[in-house]
């Protein structure tokens, strides 16, 4: 892997909640693997940068209403997984 993976405490909680909701964990694991290898995600994942409170982070869609918020720290080659959940879970919308 090109990047080491760092899970925030909140991401760990979100990941457990995703399992409890019976979401297909293999989908998020595959995306995390691609990101850790420095690969671009397919267009269907709608990967894009965030602004405001999430400036410096990126967001991609695992499914239409299941998101992954992450950021790269290229100085130390770390992929930080910040949050996962629905739009309302993450942004209150």
Regions found by a protein language model. Give the residues of each.
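Enriched for short, Lys/Arg-rich terminal
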Residues: 2-4, 10-16, 20-26, 30, ...
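A short, surface-exposed loop/turn module that caps and links secondary-structure elements
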Residues: 33-61
């Amino acid at each position: 892997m090109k990047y080491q993976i760092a899970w925030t405490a909140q991401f760990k909680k979100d990941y457990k909640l995703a399992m409890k909701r019976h979401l297909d964990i293999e989908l998020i694991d595959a995306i995390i693997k691609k990101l850790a290898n420095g690969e671009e995600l397919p267009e269907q994942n709608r990967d894009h940068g965030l602004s405001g409170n999430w400036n410096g982070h990126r967001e991609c869609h695992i499914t239409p209403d299941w998101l992954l918020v992450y950021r790269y720290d290229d100085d130390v080659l770390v992929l930080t997984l910040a949050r996962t959940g629905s739009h309302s879970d993450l942004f209150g919308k």
